[in-house]
């Protein structure tokens, strides 16, 4: 992998709750990853095609339905690995042959660049964030004006507090 990242990211607001689907791609290789594929992905897939991107990975921040409900649609057309935190995989209990279980501080390549995982339990036991360059894809761990709910199945306010504190203390300003 090279030192200088060539990654770009685009957000798409989808579904009745305006969830965010992220598309990350390497500008050199055109390899792409989709984060939290949910709801209608028409706009995302059209953008991918328009830019000549090659979808290579599915990344999940957590397993709630509103973040994963289009995985099967993607897998009908593509044989893609699904990256998920190991604790979330156990919590979700959904079986896919192509799950790649990650741990905190793991990293993997996308094209010629690297993406790191950060385990951020609280919203769910295996919630995670993805970090690259100066970007943080936080799923439902962190919002502009708050954090994800901790009162749903698997949520834990104390773990959320510790996760947010960890993000604050360990990410570059």
Which residue stretches match the model-derived regions?
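Divalent metal-coordination and catalytic microenvironments
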Residues: 24, 36, 62, 74, ...
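Metallo-beta-lactamase
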Residues: 119, 124-173
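Active-site HxH/HxHxD metal-binding segment of metal-dependent hydrolases
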Residues: 18, 32, 39-116
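A short linear hydrophobic-aromatic micro-motif
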Residues: 8-11, 116-117, 173
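Short loop segments at secondary-structure junctions
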Residues: 27-29, 79, 113, 133-135, ...
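Conserved beta-strand hairpin/beta-sheet module of binuclear metal-dependent hydrolase folds
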Residues: 2-51, 129-139
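Short Gly/Pro-enriched turn/cap motifs at secondary-structure boundaries
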Residues: 12-13, 99, 119-121
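Aromatic/hydrophobic pocket-lining residues that form the small-molecule binding cavity
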Residues: 37, 68, 160, 164
């Amino acid at each position: 992998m090279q030192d200088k990242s060539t990654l770009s990211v685009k957000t798409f607001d989808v579904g009745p709750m305006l969830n965010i689907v992220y598309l990350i791609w390497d500008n050199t290789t055109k390899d792409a990853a989709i984060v939290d594929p949910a709801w209608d992905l028409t706009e995302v897939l059209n953008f991918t095609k328009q830019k000549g991107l090659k979808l290579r990975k599915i990344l999940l921040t957590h397993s709630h339905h509103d973040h994963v409900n289009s995985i099967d649609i993607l897998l009908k057309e593509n044989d893609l690995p699904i990256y998920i935190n190991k604790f979330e995989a156990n919590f979700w209990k959904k079986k896919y042959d192509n799950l790649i279980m990650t741990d905190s501080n793991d990293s993997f390549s996308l094209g010629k660049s690297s993406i790191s995982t950060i385990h951020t339990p609280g919203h769910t036991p295996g919630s995670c964030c993805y970090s690259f360059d100066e970007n943080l894809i936080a799923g439902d761990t962190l919002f502009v004006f708050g954090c994800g709910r901790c009162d749903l199945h698997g949520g834990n306010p104390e773990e959320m507090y510790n996760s947010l504190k960890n993000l604050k203390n360990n990410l570059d300003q």
